[in-house]
Curated annotation (Swiss-Prot):
Gene, per the UniProt record: groES
Stated name of the protein: Co-chaperonin GroES
Assembly mode: Heptamer of 7 subunits arranged in a ring. Interacts with the chaperonin GroEL.
Keywords, alphabetical: Chaperone, Cytoplasm
InterPro entries, sorted: Chaperonin_GroES, Chaperonin_GroES_sf, Chaprnonin_Cpn10_CS, GroES-like_sf
Disulfide bonds: none
GO BP: any one term: chaperone cofactor-dependent protein refolding
C-alpha cells in the first residue's frame, strides 16, 4: 500500500516501547503501555505549510490521542494533523 497524506497531515510509524526493564525483566504488553507511547517516525508528509521543520525519517512526539490508525499487513501507521506533532526528537 502506498499512503500519501494530503494537506497538513503526516503519516507516522509508532515506535514500540521497550518491553523489558533496564535490569532485563520482561514486561507484559499491559504493563509496558505499548499502545500509549507517543513517539513515532515520520514516514510521509503532505504538502501543507505547517510542515516546515519536519522531514521524512524524523522521530517526533505527537499528541497521544490524535490521528487515525491504518494497518498495512502487520505494520500499524497513524495519520495525524501537523498541529498534533508536539516536538522533533534530536
Amino acid at each position: 500500500m502506498n499512503i500519501k497524506p494530503i494537506g497538513e497531515r503526516v503519516l507516522l510509524k509508532p515506535i514500540k516501547k521497550e518491553e523489558k526493564t533496564k535490569s532485563g525483566i520482561l514486561l507484559s504488553s499491559k504493563s509496558s503501555n505499548t499502545d500509549t507511547k507517543n513517539e513515532a517516525e515520520v514516514v510521509a508528509l503532505g504538502k501543507g505549510e505547517k510542515l516546515e521543520g519536519i522531514k521524512v525519517g524524523d522521530k517526533v512526539i505527537f499528541n497521544k490521542f490524535s490521528g487515525n490508525e491504518i494497518e498495512d499487513g502487520d505494520i500499524k501507521y497513524l495519520i495525524v494533523n501537523a498541529d498534533d506533532i508536539l516536538a522533533v526528537i534530536e
